């Protein structure tokens, strides 16, 4: 028996969504929500709040949360433009009439965290990622927003899925990570 070929690749959410829509990928795990006109079926796996990653010093020690308006006063370190979360943050800033001062864009959360430690600015990262960082030098505060980091599976509506893709979806059924 031949085993199915499984290819795992990494890319920003928008790049991955485009690959699924073009038929280059059968399905993918990506940030949700996707654009309504994308004709993609989605299955939410988990959802987490966003945090503002700051140095453990100065005025940040007095803060308990950070509003989108407060972020305008600080250089901002965020994900690359091909990340869905980056697009969602830009929409959040527009809704709150905030003009962000973007200092650094990266696809690597550990690089963004290192830049915060170096004093370059503040970053917006999902809470589970913040929990992996050094609490002695960094602090993460809730972002005052209903925006959440949601990850889920996507695939093209009404298109045949291979047996391996169907098996992977079945594997993901009921799979959620704790809040």
Where on the chain are the PLM-derived regions?
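Thr-Gly-centered strand-to-loop micro-motif
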Residues: 54-55, 79-80, 102, 125-126
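Flexible hinge/capping segments at coil-to-helix
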Residues: 39-50, 54-76
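Short hydrophobic/charged patches on amphipathic alpha-helices used for structural packing
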Residues: 17, 21, 42, 68, ...
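Central regulatory/effector-binding core of bacterial HTH transcription factors
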Residues: 2-37, 99, 105-108
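Secondary-structure junction motif
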Residues: 60, 75-96, 161-170, 178-179
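Beta-alpha-beta core module
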Residues: 37-48, 63-64, 110-158
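A bilobed periplasmic-binding-protein/Venus flytrap-type ligand-binding module shared by bacterial periplasmic
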Residues: 53-59, 152-161
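N-terminal winged-helix
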Residues: 2-18, 81, 88, 126, ...
